[in-house]
Design a protein with these regions (language model features):
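Mature, well-folded catalytic/scaffold domains that follow N-terminal targeting or propeptide regions
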Residues: 1-126
Length: 126
């Protein structure tokens, strides 16, 4: 996972959260990572952990919506977000409540930030 961190760090700082989010989505959706690799990814994300977790949340919601949650998505959710895949997917739904543009920030970005903040703060929907 050090190679992932190096590749992301090669981009401008303004793009890194988006890239960490993509790494989280790929890890949780596609699978194929060992527990050690997932732990390493979490550590490597460092200050970008909320963005990584938001990508994981997108994967969990996508798999839930398709009715194909699986063990690797569950494992990644538990390691990165410290919650079950169902709980993480529910956070994406809760973050849609009263969603709108905020001072020129597009609604999609507001949604992403809400997910990041709710996961970082340990917010649950149950």
């Amino acid at each position: 996972m050090a190679a992932v961190a190096r590749a992301i760090d090669a981009f401008p700082a303004t793009r890194r959260d988006d890239l960490w989010s993509g790494a989280g989505l790929a890890c949780a959706y596609a699978g194929g990572c060992s527990r050690t690799a997932i732990d390493s990814l979490r550590v490597a994300a460092n200050k970008h952990l909320p963005a990584l977790a938001q990508g994981v949340a997108f994967a969990a919601k996508t798999r839930q919506r398709a009715a194909n949650l699986n063990a690797h998505t569950e494992n990644v959710c538990r390691v990165i977000c410290e919650r079950s895949a169902e709980e993480v997917a529910a956070i994406t739904d809760a973050a849609l409540q009263d969603l709108h543009e905020d001072g020129g920030v597009p609604a999609y970005e507001v949604w992403r930030r809400r997910i990041q903040n709710n996961i970082a703060l340990g917010v649950t929907t149950t």
